[in-house]
Amino acid sequence: MSVDATLSFEEAMEKYDPVLGFEVHVELNTKTKMFSSAPNVFGDEPNTNVNEVDLGMPGVLPVVNKTAVESSIKIGLALNCKIAEYCRFARKNYFYPDTPKNFQTSQYDEPIAYDGYLDIELEDGTVFRVEIERAHMEEDAGKLTHMGGAAGRIQGADYSLVDYNRSGVPLVEIVTKPIEGAGSRAPELAKAYVAAIREIVKNLGVSDAKMERGNVRCDANVSLRPHGRERFGIRSETKNVNSLRAVEHAVRYEIQRHAAVLDSGEPVIQETRHWHEDTRSTTSGRPKSDADDYRYFPEPDLVPVVASREWVEELRATLPEPPAERRKRLKEAWGYSDLEFRDVVNAGVMDSIEETIAAGASADVARKWWMGEIVGRAKVADVDPSELGVTPQVIVELNKLVEDGKINNKMATQVLDGVLAGEGTPAEIVEKRGLAVVSDDGPLLEAIDAALAAQPDVAEKIRGGKVQAIGAIVGGVMKATRGQADAGRVRELILEKLGVEG
């Protein structure tokens, strides 16, 4: 695999203006496929969820999945699109082994949703409006697995296996209009846009939205034009990018590659590209086809979809609060700073914090536990924080043990470890591990006497007015009591013992 020459991103931005475009494919989580009764289930044995309609057997007829149509309308509404009162399916004709019918049932000039927009908030709060050209319904293709090659791609493979379980799974393809004016923030905008689409479809409940499973896939189009020129440049399309980080890096790389090609005096080739995460680069795929090459024509086996205004309004009434509006509401209610709230969102614990507050914790307590303890443990385990098994009720119970003085913060982290290890509830773990705070002054005074005797110089400093030196004595007591002393009470007793006012 050869990697093309690139210009530095900064040099590219000095000379050229990037124009972006995205086609995001969203797999719908319906029980059955788009046009057949075959199950829509991820991860089953290859070629077990497939029937005659999916394979295009002679004499079989497709039937439109009503739930898929409703999900498509919901997506269109969430993207501020107009919903077509009348739309049709079309056949997109091409031959490839993962398309057993030799055509894909899609929509061409009559999509179900069109002319929308989505406001994207970047990390610094800048809002960038992305205009949506269309959102149309179609079916997914099967999945090819290339065997024998080093990179799992068709190049160099000995043979390929095809799994038709995915063939016919409902898709909504969301196509943007050309995105101009992003400048050096184009890669950041690309990532934020796909993240917003993923968040919206997950919030709607119409897709599992797991990019690692291919539920959300992005084709990223990039072209460059010299500053001041109106006409668009030749674009490339990086296909099936399946992570947010990869979308950002792929757009950045293509900008740098295009700039190097243009600087060399060579023409940019209109083509598809493949993204390689290991080298963070793209390689050439095939010449990019135009719509005419697919010979679209209306699907003769399916009747048009008529979305009455009453039906559309019924679906609109079921839409949940938009994610952006919800974030704004929660930020104001919780009183977090911009940075604090951004960290919460980026860590993926906003829902968990909301549930913890609803369970009885304060906003600050919920953030302290989720951001201060649980997110870090999730990173170490390389899982999502929600997958650790810590419930809002656990956080509330754990924090109450601290507030009631039964355990201190250090013990609380040990209790949390016990919860993660499946040892029981916080109260049960405190009892099993013997983690109660030492509240009897007798043992504390004994430990204080020992600590003062071991550090007489520190004791003299405290008597002399250097009260900040008390930390060393407190530390000695905490060590002697295996962290089970109340540090605040220990400090009070030390000052009383030395006759010093704190």
Swiss-Prot record:
Its EC number is 6.3.5.-. Keywords: ATP-binding, Ligase, Nucleotide-binding, Protein biosynthesis. One of its GO terms (molecular function) is asparaginyl-tRNA synthase (glutamine-hydrolyzing) activity. It catalyses: L-glutamyl-tRNA(Gln) + L-glutamine + ATP + H2O = L-glutaminyl-tRNA(Gln) + L-glutamate + ADP + phosphate + H(+); L-aspartyl-tRNA(Asn) + L-glutamine + ATP + H2O = L-asparaginyl-tRNA(Asn) + L-glutamate + ADP + phosphate + 2 H(+). InterPro entries: Asn/Gln-tRNA_amidoTrfase_suB/E (IPR017959), Asn/Gln-tRNA_Trfase_suB/E_cat (IPR006075), Asn/Gln_amidotransferase (IPR018027), Asn/Gln_tRNA_amidoTrase-B-like (IPR003789), GatB (IPR004413), GatB_Yqey_C_2 (IPR023168), Gln-tRNA_amidoTrfase_suB_CS (IPR017958), Gln_synth/guanido_kin_cat_dom (IPR014746). Gene3D superfamilies: 1.10.10.410. Residues 272-293 are annotated as: Disordered. One of its GO terms (biological process) is translation. Allows the formation of correctly charged Asn-tRNA(Asn) or Gln-tRNA(Gln) through the transamidation of misacylated Asp-tRNA(Asn) or Glu-tRNA(Gln) in organisms which lack either or both of asparaginyl-tRNA or glutaminyl-tRNA synthetases. The reaction takes place in the presence of glutamine and ATP through an activated phospho-Asp-tRNA(Asn) or phospho-Glu-tRNA(Gln). Belongs to the GatB/GatE family. GatB subfamily. Heterotrimer of A, B and C subunits. This is Aspartyl/glutamyl-tRNA(Asn/Gln) amidotransferase subunit B. It comes from Paenarthrobacter aurescens (strain TC1).
